[in-house]
Amino acid sequence: LHRDSPLIDIRWLTSPATLHFAGAILLMRIVLAEQTVGASNFFQALGIQNEQTLPLYGIILCAILAGGVTCALLLRPGRENWFYGTALACVALGAWLDSGATSQTRPHDIWLSQALVAYGSGLFLPAAMAQGMGSAIVRGPLYILSFITVFLFTQSIGGLLGSAIFGTFITLRTSFH
């Protein structure tokens, strides 16, 4: 804390704006873990094999790429909040569409809902990265490492927490049925 140019600026990392940003992308990463853990564990619990879910994962990949392309074409400084809102709406709609899943649900039944979640993911992460990196660049090159530290930490911890939460939920729910 008492260096002229620290490798990682603790004051900036603990500022309200940075903590708000980190909290938001951490929560979004936890929510997005549903797609990687929830859907795959759900189908695994139903006895559906990997080759039966291959088209679903192809659709998810295409939707993520579409979200990234949309960001590349439309994202400009100051528009990030629009992307956040749209991403959240896509994820919420996809989750709502999946809320009626039963033991009769098959991978083709959730193509649209999982595509919406994937598209939302493709919209959110590039916009968050651009906003955070822009904020770090404005402050100077030393803040870039601090931003990368925050971003990678939140994505790693969020993915682990999300996997643990959704995996535990699925295990508990399947033990009751």
List where the protein language model places each region.
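12-transmembrane solute porter fold
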Residues: L7-S175
